[in-house]
């Protein structure tokens, strides 16, 4: 169900979030 999807999303963000933010900041400063 959607709750499982939400839980996976949160786990994914917890794992990937810092890298995504770092990449976005690098793209913005180029």
Curated annotation (Swiss-Prot):
Question: Where found in the cell?
Answer: Secreted
Identify the tissues in which this protein is expressed. Answer: Expressed by the venom gland.
GO BP term (any one): killing of cells of another organism
Query: Out of the domains of life, which is the source?
Result: Eukaryota
* Keyword 4Fe-4S listed: no
**What GO cellular component is one of the record's annotations?**
extracellular region
Kindly list the cysteine pairs connected by disulfide bridges.
none
Q: What does this protein do?
A: Shows a broad spectrum of activity against both Gram-positive and Gram-negative bacteria. Also has antimicrobial activity against S.cerevisiae. Has insecticidal and non-hemolytic activity.
Task: Spell out the family assignment given in the record's similarity comment.
Answer: Belongs to the ponericin-G family.
| Protein's name according to its UniProt entry | U1-poneritoxin-Ng3b
């Amino acid at each position: 169900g959607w709750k499982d999807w939400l839980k996976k999303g949160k786990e994914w963000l917890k794992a990937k979030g810092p890298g995504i933010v770092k990449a976005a900041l690098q793209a913005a400063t180029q």
